[in-house]
């Protein structure tokens, strides 16, 4: 199959959705790489833009194909009488189609999750959904404004996925998702993944921090999804014990390891020691105009986090903001400033800082 990152797949959308009957698409990839999130966000947004709508104007219906039998998926045959009184069989309307109708939306996405893990009989009845010329299920037409997309794991991922039937694959375009650490780091920064994890991924993402596929041995491994889950535990722990707290022992290490395995956890622990090269929140608050800005991108991310977490009042938030604006990596500076302003808004901290106003005007579109 064609290998492509999410960014590369997204580049196809202006052309893919430039027709009234876009070809169905299947995304194959490892566990936890973000296929579902990509379909719900980037794909939904692109389809909406092609229609002159917003993402919220579109319906979104998810159906997990695995665990369904063919009748449950396509509808159940029931005996009925025709006008002449003769008995005949008629299929009930498929539950999936009822879900689509219940949204009340003219346009939307039907997302068929875990498609490769579905029984072959289910793949067979779903075949017409994957053919834009048929666009139906169990003999019932699907609404013309609804796009069909499926996703699932590869057969090599040890998740119960099988090869898709050939008569299904020649009607769709299939991409095998190639995980991109830089793309994930951008997403993670916008979705409150802890900066220590993002910095570690930036530094070690290309040398085995993330698993390309499940290991041969039966153990936890690091995926984009599992490290995102681990981030919640790390964030809660460091918020309570301080951003410089040791993570090489006790409860926090166990919690992280239970998500990403021992090897990736040790990589994160080793990287966390580098926090000693980054200014502390106290140092930033003491002199935000002169406090050191690290050269390394990963260190800058940690320094920005120190600045954000040092903000406990409106005045300290202004000082943290001043330091953040001095950071030389634009994405880190912008996203950290945005994060800090969310904290300021939640705490109802007012500011008279000219820098904040200038920043908001300059980056209004990004914000």
Tell me the role of every PLM-derived stretch:
Residues 1-203:
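AAA+ P-loop NTPase catalytic core and its hallmark functional loops
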Residues 188-257:
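Conserved AAA+ ATPase small/helical "lid" subdomain
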Residues 203, 207, 240, 258, ...:
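Surface-exposed polar/charged interaction patches
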Residues 249, 253, 261, 265, ...:
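Short amphipathic alpha-helical segments that mediate assembly, nucleic-acid/protein binding
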């Amino acid at each position: 199959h064609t290998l492509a990152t999410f960014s590369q797949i997204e580049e196809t959308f202006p052309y893919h959705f430039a027709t009234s009957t876009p070809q169905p698409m299947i995304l194959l990839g490892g566990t936890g790489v973000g296929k579902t999130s990509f379909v719900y966000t980037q794909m939904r947004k692109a389809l909406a833009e092609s229609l002159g709508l917003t993402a919220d104007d579109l319906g979104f219906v998810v159906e997990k194909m695995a665990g369904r039998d063919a009748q449950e998926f396509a509808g159940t045959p029931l005996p009925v009488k025709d006008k002449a009184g003769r008995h005949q069989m008629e299929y009930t309307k498929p539950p999936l189609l009822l879900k689509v109708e219940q949204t009340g939306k003219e346009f939307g996405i039907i997302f068929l999750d875990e498609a490769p893990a579905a029984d072959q009989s289910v793949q067979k009845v779903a075949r017409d959904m994957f053919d834009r010329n048929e666009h139906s299920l169990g003999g019932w037409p699907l609404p013309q404004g609804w796009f069909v997309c499926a996703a699932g794991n590869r057969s090599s991922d040890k998740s119960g996925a099988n090869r898709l039937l050939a008569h299904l694959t020649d009607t769709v375009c299939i991409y095998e998702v190639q995980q991109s650490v830089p793309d994930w780091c951008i997403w993670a920064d916008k979705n409150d993944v802890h900066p220590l994890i993002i910095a570690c991924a930036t530094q070690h993402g290309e040398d085995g921090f993330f698993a390309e596929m499940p290991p041969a041995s039966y153990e936890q491994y690091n995926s984009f999804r599992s490290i995102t889950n681990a981030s919640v535990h790390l964030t809660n722990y460091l918020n309570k014990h301080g951003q410089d707290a040791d993570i090489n022992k006790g409860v926090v290490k166990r919690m992280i390891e239970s998500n990403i395995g021992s090897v990736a956890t040790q990589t994160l622990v080793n990287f966390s020691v580098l926090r000693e090269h980054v200014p502390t929140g106290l140092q930033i608050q003491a002199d935000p105009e002169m406090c050191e800005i690290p050269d390394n991108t990963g260190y800058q991310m940690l320094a920005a986090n120190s600045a954000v977490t040092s903000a406990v009042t409106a005045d300290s938030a202004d000082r943290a903001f001043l330091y953040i604006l001095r950071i030389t990596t634009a994405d880190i500076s912008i996203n950290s400033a945005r994060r800090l302003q969310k904290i300021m808004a939640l705490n109802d901290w007012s500011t008279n800082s000219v820098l904040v106003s200038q920043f908001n005007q300059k980056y209004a579109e990004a914000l």
